[in-house]
Amino acid sequence: MVGSGAPQRGSAAATASMRRRKPTSGAGGGGASGGAAGSMLQFYTDDAPGLKISPNVVLIMSIGFIAFVAVLHVMGKLYFVK
């Protein structure tokens, strides 16, 4: 692979060439409102495998998990005090 013209995956040259690429679809090219929204929406396609949940559900589940761990921590501290 020494003489193949493409840079190795993960190298700085490969990263730089990925940054220089222009988007070929119409979703990523808009004006002020289309830049971030177009790149974010491409992750939420209908043919993507896995669960289809909104970012709000992920946020609520994360906060619930953090609260659950905090409650377990407090219960553990109180249990060992007795």
From Swiss-Prot:
The alphabetical list of record keywords is:
Acetylation, Endoplasmic reticulum, Membrane, Protein transport, Translocation, Transmembrane, Transmembrane helix, Transport
Pfam families, per the entry: Sec61_beta (PF03911)
Q: Where are the transmembrane segments?
A: 56-76
Membrane topology summary: Single-pass membrane protein
List every position bearing N-acetylmethionine: M1
Task: Show which residues sit on the Cytoplasmic side of the membrane.
Answer: 1-55
Q: Does the keyword Transport apply?
A: yes
Q: Which GO terms describe its cellular component?
A: endoplasmic reticulum membrane; Sec61 translocon complex
The primary location reported for this protein is: endoplasmic reticulum
Q: Please name the InterPro entries in this protein's record.
A: Sec61-beta/Sbh, SecG/Sec61-beta/Sbh
Instruction: List localization entries.
Output: Endoplasmic reticulum membrane
Query: What processes in GO biological process is this protein linked to?
Result: intracellular protein transport
Q: Where is this region: Disordered?
A: 1-34
Q: How does it assemble?
A: Heterotrimeric complex composed of SEC61-alpha, SEC61-beta and SEC61-gamma.
Which family, according to UniProt? Answer: Belongs to the SEC61-beta family.
Biological function: Necessary for protein translocation in the endoplasmic reticulum.
| Entry protein name | Protein transport protein Sec61 subunit beta
Which species does this protein come from? Arabidopsis thaliana (Mouse-ear cress)
